[in-house]
Amino acid sequence: MRFLSFILVLVAITPGRAADLKDLPANTWMEIKYATDQPADPEAKGEFARQGWNKIVYDPDGKRVLFYDRWIDKKHGGYTIYGNCLFGLDPGAARLSPIKIDNWTKMETKQGGYRTLVLPENEREPTPCPRHVYHAFDYVPALKSVFICNGANQTALRDGKLVGHDLCDGAWQLDLASNKWTLLAAAGGPPNRLDDAMAYCPVTHSLIYAGFERQLWVFDLAKKEWRKAKQSPPQRTAFGETIFYDPPRQRMLILGGGRLDAWKTPPAAEFRELHAFDPKTESVERLADAPTAFYATHLAYDSKRDLFFAAAVFDQKEHPSGMFRYDPKGNAWSEVKLASPIPPHKNWFGWTQMCYDSHDDCLIGKVNDKFFALRYVAGE
């Protein structure tokens, strides 16, 4: 998707200066100039290389932003377009850490291109196949764990045979205390049709998966069981739909999505749809349409102000561009007036990623390999 996004402010947050985040100018995107930590394993020393097709979430326990993307080093095969590592960004300390690198590597082929295959370490300690996780990724505070489900990797090998996305089927849990992955082998889960979304619902202690044709699945974290939800939004193609939890109202918000690349042809009204899913009754309600088209869009929930924030910039002016807030109390959208422009993207998958840092009371934005912070002030 060819979003431009948040324009770089001339000032930046210096590494190690946590106080900067609590004293940001109002409604101004400021870059966080971070330093990158290295793994203890000398063979795994490398660098972060953003690939996109993922989601960022805030971990209030670790006071950090979590996301799954690409770590490039010799041991794990260098560059591919697929994520292979859980990262943590400490916004206050301005440090990025590779928390867990998967035990997979890359092999070049004689015909050109590459294949993804396991390292010997994966026999002793299984890890998920590298992938685009899309939005099927979340942190569960009650379990101090990260969960992923399904995803894409068309280069994946099993026993020397190309099986592609099939190696990304199913859900995994990363226990952050032990730093170990566990495959959650449970039948009846959502099919892996790519570009899906998932979010944690604390009121039912479950993961709600928004998948193929906008159908919803529920994963009971206590029973480790999947089942289809009683009701889902009206069935249709919904690549790039996203789902987020609304804490005060104890419901899930399901935003946007549609036919692949159909947002390029206005009005593309399906990309503006917003629905609420009640996890207790498993009923669905249509809410106010968004002011622009949303594809793989983050709805960042600001718990202090009880507002959701989202952003999108369309370089061909197919739809309105800007940063928008959704007031769940009044079921109303409005545009946020910024003191600085939104930093730019330079590639087609440059959608804006955002989450709310409750410790520092600011929004954290990710644009390619850059991170930004913004302190929202109403009326300025």
Positions of predicted regions on the chain:
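Sec-dependent N-terminal signal peptides
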Residues: 3-12
